Amino acid sequence: MRTAELKRETKETKIDIQLNLDGTGESSIQTGVGFFDHMLTLLAFHSQMDLHVKVEGDTWVDAHHTVEDVGIALGQLIVKSLGDKVGIRRYGSSYMPMDETLARAVIDVSGRPFLVYQADIRNPKLGDFDTELAEEFFRAVAMNGRLTLHLAVLYGSNSHHMIEGLFKAFGRALAEAVSSDGTNRLPSTKGWIEG
């Protein structure tokens, strides 16, 4: 099984996180940021990975450190759980409708971290979650997971639906990218993938 866990402690956050890429979508999420908990639960469900996250963060400041540090930790666990990347599809994509919104995620498990994020989120805040933190989370996952990640809200008007669509699309695309391609080879003509 492709699993990994991490305990990460800084002066801003204390994180205990476990990931199973070959799970069933089971999750237990406690970040102290309600909307973010909801998004991570959706991510686990739609990627079919098991994700357990417990965070003690400086949320009295704001949610930035918590959200970014969870992204860093999740990215590191993706790298660790994938190991040598032999036999994975490498690429994944998903379109996700959410009522009036259409979101898209495209992933390359390339070893070359890059994020393109195109989402005009209208509300600056959803509950205790600053909507700009969605981009910070995905950047942290992409950089630390060594993923090329393109995310876009193609259209929509409801900020909750837009961010939810991105998390769900990312989950589906990630599930495809890390799934087996039925071979025992590295998915690169170079014979090498960084990270």
Swiss-Prot record:
GO terms for biological process: L-histidine biosynthetic process. Keywords: Amino-acid biosynthesis, Cytoplasm, Histidine biosynthesis, Lyase. CDD domains: IGPD. It comes from the Bacteria. SUPFAM superfamilies: Ribosomal protein S5 domain 2-like. It holds the Pfam family IGPD. Pathway: Amino-acid biosynthesis; L-histidine biosynthesis; L-histidine from 5-phospho-alpha-D-ribose 1-diphosphate: step 6/9. GO terms for cellular component: cytoplasm. It catalyses: D-erythro-1-(imidazol-4-yl)glycerol 3-phosphate = 3-(imidazol-4-yl)-2-oxopropyl phosphate + H2O. It is found in: Cytoplasm. Its main location: cytoplasm. Its EC number is 4.2.1.19. GO terms for molecular function: imidazoleglycerol-phosphate dehydratase activity. Belongs to the imidazoleglycerol-phosphate dehydratase family. This is Imidazoleglycerol-phosphate dehydratase. It comes from Exiguobacterium sp. (strain ATCC BAA-1283 / AT1b).
